[in-house]
Amino acid sequence: MGLRPWMTRAHAPFLLATFLCAAAPLLADEPLFDLKPIAEGVYAAIARPKFILNCNALVVVLEDGVLVVDTHSKPSAAKGLIDQIKTVTDKPVRYVVNTHFHWDHNQGNAAYLSAWPGGVEVISSEATAESVEQRGIPRIEHEIATRPKEIERLRTEASAAKDPVARLKLEGQLKETEAYVAELKNMQMKLPTMTFDHNLVLRRGPRTVLMLVLGKAHTDGDVFVFLPKEKVLASGDALQGWMPYMADGHPYDWIRTLEDAQKLDFDMTVGGHGDVLRGKGQFELWKSYLRDLMAETAKAYAGGASLDEARTRVADALATRYESRFSAAGLPAESFRPSLTGNIEKAYRVVSGQQD
């Protein structure tokens, strides 16, 4: 099976958004996450910016243990969150949910199974489990094979850097990338152990957790995790604090899926990246953006525009409408155009019939 665009170049703007958010490199002993209480026994673990991307997590304390939504880019990151979880509860993690198959949301699964052998269920949609096995595992092999080139680039740039701040930054990136590759070489990917197609309900004491597949969106198997009593939603990357990342997305379905998710009664959303979202304004922003992106791209294609021409036309049309709105939502201004370009390429493939 061939490698897909999300594995390499197409993820670059999304990674850029993460890195540009960092004001300074984290010290080795600093936590990787800000663990924010958002309801009684419910925490948003907001990932601090790192060169090797981590996702956010939702931590839910249940009667018989803890449920965690998403496990980040590597076991060591998940281990870091496990240590932070132990500061707020002595209950074991019993359930881990993978919202979708992308690497930065599930490569830490093994840390939970190591911490509590035989006592953790890894839950996902059936579509996500299949994609983790068929695409996620080959991606790990691809990373091990290709990251050394990045390591050499970083080493060269760090050696040549004359500015001490720039050199320190590059040396930090180099160290982080070397550690990541070493960890991948020794990592055994742990696949979901429990899957479902439409919804799964977990009732533990007074807490009810709904796991919902509402339709195609960011991928073909996105899971929303909903706490009806607490009015909290975890959305993975189907809705997060920056721009949509569309390489594996289904834009027309995505709009409908967001509409269905929006009908749920929630006050807060913990997306895969960015800060906790209050209200439903981000849903409206994303739906509007997706509609306009597809309409402008379809218009350009119908007018005979090539992909290169569409990139320029659609970017110019959407920049005036959305650059300031996404910047206000937390996306660094420097990453708006690169992120938009990748999404235009996806939209063009859809309107031209190359993809759905």
Predicted features by range, described:
Residues 10-25:
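Bacterial N-terminal signal peptides
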Residues 36-87, 223-237:
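Conserved beta-strand hairpin/beta-sheet module of binuclear metal-dependent hydrolase folds
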Residues 37, 185-191, 195-227:
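Core dinuclear metal-dependent hydrolase active-site scaffold
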Residues 69-71, 94-102, 123-126, 213-214, ...:
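Active-site neighborhood of phospho(di)ester-bond hydrolases with catalytic His/Asp-centered motifs
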Residues 86-192, 201, 296:
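Active-site HxH/HxHxD metal-binding segment of metal-dependent hydrolases
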Residues 208-264:
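Active-site-proximal loop/helix segments of hydrolase catalytic cores
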Residues 255-309, 313:
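Divalent-metal (often Zn2+) His-rich catalytic cores of metallo-beta-lactamase-fold enzymes
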Residues 302-356:
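C-terminal regulatory/interaction regions
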